[in-house]
């Protein structure tokens, strides 16, 4: 066969990237080169992180056989990270689930029984009985769902409708609670609207990049490649990296800063003080577009109310704040002097000054990037607010090349968890369940009785664990997440609740994960391009893809599972009589008819699909389900700053960044000439706030919930590595990625290892107040902790590091702090 130059270059690009990572990709390379003419290609966003890279998926004979970077994708411009090139292999692990499994003994469900193959009807029979019993005996607060930032947009929307409108339970929360909740609350407090104002185009125009708790070299490698290109092609560009340990992003850093855990709050306030003391405030911007407020302090640590730290807190969980003058704010940050900051953080003075000068220099366009180091923090919301302060003081915001930017870790943590509103307190388009007007808007749009959606905030992720353990949450369905491995404090909180005989646990997943094996019922699930989907990435870019292959065996999409299960319930079985009396025409109807097969959702005929286009759900139901759900959902944001384009536009485009008004996407929000919601002459308008002004918050340093002491003498931080994604449920089934990093290790400073008579390669027991794990000592490698801190990734199911972590959370966002707890080491 003939091979074009372009095809040859694509094939060699695959091999080159793999070689750089020390891997071989013979299967993928052969698929691209040797079968070029036989493969059918179609676009999709990558299945992994929140960057939102575009890929071209190659299918042949009903299987995904190849994947390459999409040269027309504006995010990655044809380049993938090493995980992206191995996307086909995540779908075909030898242990892929293809049929429901129920714990059974003597032909019946038994909590202590063995997993037994059953049919979908049998699975739904058991689920129906458990849900109806719980609802009848204990009410809507006894059921719950834990979802995902990996749900497609319409899966999250369908799940939220089923629980909040159908079952009348707000006990639905996404795993994004563990990673992005602090960013959400930070955005809402400062700007009144969620998500970043900038976009990836900032990278090519910035003069300085500051990474706060973000190892972009491994966690967002495609964006890091763009930053690297910007830095190496322009000698005036500066990169500063802040972390509690040294990692691969430090290799590019002009100013690599290692600080004591939790003391990032001190550094942020010091920089604000530096800006003021050096007359670097952008007075015109500041006077027109900013308000000042002093936040409540001593707010606790999101632990159980009986915990001593919660009892001691003066204002546990308080989000209160009060107006303050500029002079009072100036006095507040004045306490954070260079000397005090250096002492509290362990950072040399010259490094602190260099960092502060980047923000203070009016001629430097600065982007602040952060991820889990900021968000997984008992003061994560404060950290977000404090970095916004720096950009608001200097006016370095909402313009090309400068602004604060919270990066996401999941492909649709923004598009689904945040924008759709699958959090326990949220509704679509930044609306919340506690606001009567917001509930009314949803109830009218969904044509359900007024008062259907509960006003009470549901259980967040950690609260769900506690309620399961306490026997208050009795039926629990998790989808598209492996929380038994990923969530905190496994031994004390989560596992006891999952295995409590009072509770029934359902896990929907493509693979037998740690969570699945701890459940009572496992539902085999379709993944990625085995269904039609949509994700929303970190830069507000919504991206669609078509179903390209069918799932193996009887595996079904999360959307199919939700919609089909809703058929099992009639309104009178889930709603009280007073609600039914308000809309008697809904009496006798199933939740499927009320929520999904409505005139609003079912109005798009399946004939809109091409004859050869796969779409299992829509063809089974007889209408274009995904389009109907999306258009209904998109209605909530249109005209309110969250405008999404028409459904069909996304199948044609490589994603569009909202708000999309009159067919045009928005790159920079809140600034005149860039944002259609900012009128001529306004300059800037932070229209999420009633007065159009953003808020600078005065917030102090407060210590971590747990710190090293004489017995537990080391900090433990957890996180990820380049080769694996989250709990490794997909990447560890790729032989090449597994070989590259086969098991977790404990990264430790050589002197800390020597002091404990440990050498590289030794087995070591890592012990906290909550549990212990056996790991392997690593004194070299990519991560170099300072003395006093150890680092361990959480991808390894054989080394459950979250047996060690504490379930302390940010009291405002309820997000867990996975970065700070105390451990000791014992040689094995």
From Swiss-Prot:
<keyword id="KW-0500">Molybdenum</keyword>
<keyword id="KW-0574">Periplasm</keyword>
<feature type="binding site">
    <location>
        <position position="49"/>
    </location>
    <ligand>
        <name>[4Fe-4S] cluster</name>
    </ligand>
</feature>
<dbReference type="InterPro" id="IPR010051">
    <property type="entry name" value="Periplasm_NO3_reductase_lsu"/>
</dbReference>
<feature type="binding site">
    <location>
        <position position="372"/>
    </location>
    <ligand>
        <name>Mo-bis(molybdopterin guanine dinucleotide)</name>
    </ligand>
</feature>
<dbReference type="InterPro" id="IPR027467">
    <property type="entry name" value="MopterinOxRdtase_cofactor_BS"/>
</dbReference>
<dbReference type="GO" id="GO:0045333">
    <property type="term" value="P:cellular respiration"/>
</dbReference>
<dbReference type="GO" id="GO:0050140">
    <property type="term" value="F:nitrate reductase (cytochrome) activity"/>
</dbReference>
<feature type="signal peptide" description="Tat-type signal">
    <location>
        <begin position="1"/>
        <end position="31"/>
    </location>
</feature>
<feature type="binding site">
    <location>
        <begin position="212"/>
        <end position="219"/>
    </location>
    <ligand>
        <name>Mo-bis(molybdopterin guanine dinucleotide)</name>
    </ligand>
</feature>
<keyword id="KW-0408">Iron</keyword>
<keyword id="KW-0534">Nitrate assimilation</keyword>
<keyword id="KW-0813">Transport</keyword>
<keyword id="KW-0249">Electron transport</keyword>
<feature type="binding site">
    <location>
        <position position="819"/>
    </location>
    <ligand>
        <name>Mo-bis(molybdopterin guanine dinucleotide)</name>
    </ligand>
</feature>
<feature type="binding site">
    <location>
        <position position="558"/>
    </location>
    <ligand>
        <name>Mo-bis(molybdopterin guanine dinucleotide)</name>
    </ligand>
</feature>
<feature type="binding site">
    <location>
        <begin position="508"/>
        <end position="509"/>
    </location>
    <ligand>
        <name>Mo-bis(molybdopterin guanine dinucleotide)</name>
    </ligand>
</feature>
<feature type="binding site">
    <location>
        <begin position="243"/>
        <end position="247"/>
    </location>
    <ligand>
        <name>Mo-bis(molybdopterin guanine dinucleotide)</name>
    </ligand>
</feature>
<feature type="binding site">
    <location>
        <begin position="718"/>
        <end position="727"/>
    </location>
    <ligand>
        <name>Mo-bis(molybdopterin guanine dinucleotide)</name>
    </ligand>
</feature>
<dbReference type="GO" id="GO:0005506">
    <property type="term" value="F:iron ion binding"/>
</dbReference>
<dbReference type="GO" id="GO:0042128">
    <property type="term" value="P:nitrate assimilation"/>
</dbReference>
<dbReference type="GO" id="GO:0043546">
    <property type="term" value="F:molybdopterin cofactor binding"/>
</dbReference>
<feature type="binding site">
    <location>
        <position position="46"/>
    </location>
    <ligand>
        <name>[4Fe-4S] cluster</name>
    </ligand>
</feature>
<dbReference type="Pfam" id="PF01568">
    <property type="entry name" value="Molydop_binding"/>
</dbReference>
<dbReference type="InterPro" id="IPR006311">
    <property type="entry name" value="TAT_signal"/>
</dbReference>
<keyword id="KW-0732">Signal</keyword>
<keyword id="KW-0004">4Fe-4S</keyword>
<feature type="binding site">
    <location>
        <position position="794"/>
    </location>
    <ligand>
        <name>substrate</name>
    </ligand>
</feature>
<feature type="binding site">
    <location>
        <position position="376"/>
    </location>
    <ligand>
        <name>Mo-bis(molybdopterin guanine dinucleotide)</name>
    </ligand>
</feature>
<feature type="domain" description="4Fe-4S Mo/W bis-MGD-type">
    <location>
        <begin position="39"/>
        <end position="95"/>
    </location>
</feature>
<feature type="binding site">
    <location>
        <position position="179"/>
    </location>
    <ligand>
        <name>Mo-bis(molybdopterin guanine dinucleotide)</name>
    </ligand>
</feature>
<feature type="binding site">
    <location>
        <position position="83"/>
    </location>
    <ligand>
        <name>Mo-bis(molybdopterin guanine dinucleotide)</name>
    </ligand>
</feature>
<comment type="function">
    <text>Catalytic subunit of the periplasmic nitrate reductase complex NapAB. Receives electrons from NapB and catalyzes the reduction of nitrate to nitrite.</text>
</comment>
<feature type="binding site">
    <location>
        <position position="531"/>
    </location>
    <ligand>
        <name>Mo-bis(molybdopterin guanine dinucleotide)</name>
    </ligand>
</feature>
<dbReference type="Pfam" id="PF00384">
    <property type="entry name" value="Molybdopterin"/>
</dbReference>
<dbReference type="InterPro" id="IPR006963">
    <property type="entry name" value="Mopterin_OxRdtase_4Fe-4S_dom"/>
</dbReference>
<comment type="subunit">
    <text>Component of the periplasmic nitrate reductase NapAB complex composed of NapA and NapB.</text>
</comment>
<dbReference type="InterPro" id="IPR009010">
    <property type="entry name" value="Asp_de-COase-like_dom_sf"/>
</dbReference>
<dbReference type="InterPro" id="IPR041957">
    <property type="entry name" value="CT_Nitrate-R-NapA-like"/>
</dbReference>
<dbReference type="Pfam" id="PF04879">
    <property type="entry name" value="Molybdop_Fe4S4"/>
</dbReference>
<feature type="binding site">
    <location>
        <position position="175"/>
    </location>
    <ligand>
        <name>Mo-bis(molybdopterin guanine dinucleotide)</name>
    </ligand>
</feature>
<feature type="binding site">
    <location>
        <position position="482"/>
    </location>
    <ligand>
        <name>Mo-bis(molybdopterin guanine dinucleotide)</name>
    </ligand>
</feature>
């Amino acid at each position: 066969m003939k091979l074009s130059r372009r095809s040859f270059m694509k094939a060699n690009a695959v091999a080159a990237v793999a070689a750089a990572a020390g891997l071989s990709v013979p299967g993928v390379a052969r698929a691209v080169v040797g079968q070029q003419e036989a493969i059918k290609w179609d676009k999709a966003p990558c299945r992994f992180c929140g960057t939102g890279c575009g890929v071209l998926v190659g299918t042949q004979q009903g299987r995904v056989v190849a994947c390459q970077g999409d040269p027309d994708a504006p995010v990655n411009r044809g380049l993938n990270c090493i995980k992206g090139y191995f996307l086909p292999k995540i779908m075909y692990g030898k242990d892929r689930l293809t049929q429901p499994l129920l714990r059974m003994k003597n032909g019946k469900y038994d909590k202590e029984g063995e997993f037994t193959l059953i049919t979908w009807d049998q699975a739904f029979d058991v689920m129906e009985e458990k849900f109806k019993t719980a609802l009848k005996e204990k009410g809507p607060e006894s059921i719950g769902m834990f979802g995902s930032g990996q749900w497609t947009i319409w899966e999250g929307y369908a799940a939220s409708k089923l629980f909040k409108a159908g079952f009348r339970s707000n006990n639905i929360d996404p795993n994004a609670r563990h990673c992005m909740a602090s960013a959400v609350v930070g955005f809402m407090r400062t700007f009144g609207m969620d998500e970043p104002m900038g976009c990836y185009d900032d990278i090519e125009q910035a003069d300085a990049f500051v990474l706060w708790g973000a190892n972009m070299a491994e966690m967002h490698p495609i964006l890091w490649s763009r930053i690297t290109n910007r830095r190496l092609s322009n000698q005036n560009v500066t990169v500063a990296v802040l972390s509690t340990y040294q990692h691969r992003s430090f290799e590019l850093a002009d100013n690599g800063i290692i600080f004591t855990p939790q003391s990032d709050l001190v550094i942020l306030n010091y920089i604000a003080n530096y800006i003021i003391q050096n007359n670097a405030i952008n007075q015109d911007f500041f006077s027109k577009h900013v308000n000042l407020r002093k936040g409540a302090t001593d707010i606790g640590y999101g632990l159980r109310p009986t915990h001593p730290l919660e009892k001691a807190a003066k204002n546990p969980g308080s989000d209160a704040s009060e107006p303050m003058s500029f002079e009072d704010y100036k006095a507040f940050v004045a306490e954070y002097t260079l000397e005090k900051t250096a002492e509290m953080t362990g950072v040399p003075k010259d490094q602190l000054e260099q960092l502060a000068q980047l923000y203070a220099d009016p001629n430097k366009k600065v982007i602040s990037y952060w991820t889990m180091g900021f968000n997984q923090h008992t003061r994560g919301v404060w950290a977000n607010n404090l970095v916004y302060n720096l950009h608001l003081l200097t006016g370095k915001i909402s313009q090309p090349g400068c602004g604060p930017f919270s990066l996401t870790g999941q492909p649709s943590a923004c598009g689904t968890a945040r924008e759709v509103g699958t959090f326990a307190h949220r509704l679509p388009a930044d609306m919340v369940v506690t606001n009567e007007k917001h509930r009314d808007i949803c109830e009218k749009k969904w044509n359900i009785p007024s008062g259907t959606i509960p006003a009470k905030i549901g259980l967040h992720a950690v609260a769900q664990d506690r309620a399961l353990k306490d026997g208050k949450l009795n039926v629990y369905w998790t989808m598209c997440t492996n929380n038994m491995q990923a969530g905190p404090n496994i031994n004390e909180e989560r596992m006891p609740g999952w295995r409590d005989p009072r509770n029934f646990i359902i896990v929907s997943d493509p693979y037998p994960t740690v969570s699945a094996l701890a459940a009572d019922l496992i539902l085999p699930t379709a993944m990625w391009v085995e269904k039609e989907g949509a994700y929303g990435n970190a830069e507000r870019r919504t991206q669609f893809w078509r179903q390209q292959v069918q799932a193996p065996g009887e595996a079904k999409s999360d959307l199919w599972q939700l919609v089909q299960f809703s058929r099992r319930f009639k309104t009178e079985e889930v709603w009280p009589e007073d609600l039914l009396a308000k809309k008697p025409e809904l009496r006798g109807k199933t939740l499927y008819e009320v929520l999904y097969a409505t005139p609003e959702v079912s109005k798009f005929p399946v004939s809109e699909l091409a004859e050869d286009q796969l779409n299992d759900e829509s063809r089974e139901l007889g209408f274009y389900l995904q389009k109907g759900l999306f258009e209904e959902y998109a209605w909530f944001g249109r005209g309110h700053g969250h405008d999404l384009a028409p459904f069909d536009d996304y199948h044609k485009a490589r994603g569009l960044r909202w708000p999309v008004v009159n067919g045009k996407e928005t790159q920079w929000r809140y600034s005149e000439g860039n944002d259609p919601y900012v009128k001529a002459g306004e300059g800037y308008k932070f229209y999420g706030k009633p007065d159009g002004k953003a808020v600078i918050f005065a917030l102090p340093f407060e210590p971590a919930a747990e710190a090293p002491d004489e017995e537990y003498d080391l900090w433990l931080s957890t996180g990820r590595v380049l080769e694996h994604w989250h709990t490794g449920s997909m990447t560890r089934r790729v032989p090449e990625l597994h070989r590259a990093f086969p098991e977790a290790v404990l990264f430790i400073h050589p002197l800390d290892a020597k002091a404990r008579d440990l050498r590289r390669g030794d087995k070591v027991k890592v012990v906290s107040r909550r549990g212990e794990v056996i790991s392997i000592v690593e004194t070299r490698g990519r991560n170099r902790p300072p003395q006093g801190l150890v680092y361990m990734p959480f991808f390894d199911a054989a080394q459950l590091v979250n047996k060690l972590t504490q379930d302390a959370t940010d009291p405002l966002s309820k997000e867990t702090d996975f970065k700070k707890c105390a451990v000791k080491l014992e040689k094995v």
